[in-house]
Amino acid sequence: NDIKLSLAVGFNGARLHEKIFEERFLYHADRLGYIVWGEFPNWSLDSSYADSVYGILPEWTEEIRRDFNHPAIVGWCPYNETWDTDGRKQFDDALDIVYRATKALDPTRPCIDTSGNYHVATDIFCVHDYEQNPEIFKEHYDKLMTEGTLFDNHAHRQTYKGEATFVSE
C-alpha cells in the first residue's frame, strides 16, 4: 500500500533509508515501476576503525546478492553520514573497501559510498542540505549548473570531482 500511496501523490520512487527492505516490497516496487535505492542500516557502526568493515560487509554482500535482480533498485548506498566518532576520523579505507566490493558484486548500478559525507570513492556525490530558505538553497547549487563547482560544507574532508550530484536529505 505504501508504494501505491506514494505513486498516487506523484512520487516515482524512494530512498529506502537505513534499512534492508523485504523482498515482498521490492517485488511490488518492480511490478509497479517504483524506483528505489538499496541501503544498509549502519547506525552505531563506528567507521573510525579498520575492523568496521567486518560489521557491514557480510550482510551488505548478502543484500546485494539477494536483491541484484530487482529492476526497481537503481543504486546502492552502504553507509549514511559517516561522521567522525568521539574525535576519531572515519577510516577511509573501510569505505573504499565496501565501495569496491559493491562495484565488484554489481558493476551495473551506481554506488554512493556514504550518503552525505565524508566521500572517499563514489559514483554519485550525495549531499545533505537542510537549508530551508529557497533562495539560499538555490545559491548552493547555481555554480554546479554554471561552473561545475559544488557548494560543500565539508570541502575540507572530501573533494567533488564532477560526479553526478544527489541532494538526498
Model-predicted segments: where are they?
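Glycine-rich phosphate-binding "P-loop"
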Residues: 1
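Substrate-binding/catalytic cleft of secreted carbohydrate-active enzymes
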Residues: 5, 13-169
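Metal- or metallocofactor-binding catalytic centers and their adjacent structured scaffolds
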Residues: 9
